[in-house]
């Protein structure tokens, strides 16, 4: 589902006289369907850069990032913008602890929107969104309110529900359980396990050792030549 070959990325710090900061050096990674691979390494080892490159947020300087999109393999390094948009809609999902939404949109709408965008009827989208919000312990009294009024933890759980609303073949998880209590972390772990069971290829960053041990099929060490 994911095949990364010899990806390198150097950031140029223009505000610091063009200082070059190498982050990835010929990084390679393969992830199969139904597998959760956790990127593991010290701060600055390139975990976030690789994860964001898998979502085409960063463009590597060299190498290939091949992902299975329907019946075809697509290299995200060379894919046109319209293809990246298409891939994000149906193939690659991103789940993080941060929620960025239009202030007046209700939590239920925020969660169901990605599924609506795939053409699923509104009633079915709303029902699935409600199930996810319930599982993630977001009180029903909040569903029709704007998440901008919520606590940080409530916003985080809304964002996790949004990330899991579509059954993406590939899931990228950026610290989804950071700051969550044990009960809500367990709910997220269960969602990850279910995604694995249906065959999703998952790449994640988890600093919570207990969660990492629960979900990881293997750790992928990151470093100077990851």
Swiss-Prot record:
* EC number assigned by the record: 2.7.8.37
Pfam family name, one? ABC_tran
Functionally, this protein is described as follows: Together with PhnG, PhnH and PhnI is required for the transfer of the ribose triphosphate moiety from ATP to methyl phosphonate.
Name the Gene Ontology molecular function terms of this record: alpha-D-ribose 1-methylphosphonate 5-triphosphate synthase activity; ATP binding; ATP hydrolysis activity
Give a GO cellular-component term: carbon phosphorus lyase complex
Query: Lyase: present as a keyword of the record?
Result: no
Task: Report what the protein is called.
Answer: Alpha-D-ribose 1-methylphosphonate 5-triphosphate synthase subunit PhnL
Q: Which InterPro entries match?
A: AAA+_ATPase (IPR003593), ABC_transporter-like_ATP-bd (IPR003439), ABC_transporter-like_CS (IPR017871), CP_lyase_PhnL (IPR012701), P-loop_NTPase (IPR027417)
What's its catalytic activity?
methylphosphonate + ATP = alpha-D-ribose 1-methylphosphonate 5-triphosphate + adenine
Specify the ABC transporter domain's residue ranges.
2-226
Per the similarity annotation, which family is this? Belongs to the ABC transporter superfamily.
Q: Which SUPFAM superfamilies match?
A: P-loop containing nucleoside triphosphate hydrolases (SSF52540)
Q: Which gene encodes it?
A: phnL
Annotated GO biological processes are: organic phosphonate catabolic process; organic phosphonate metabolic process; organic phosphonate transport
Positions that bind ATP: 41-48
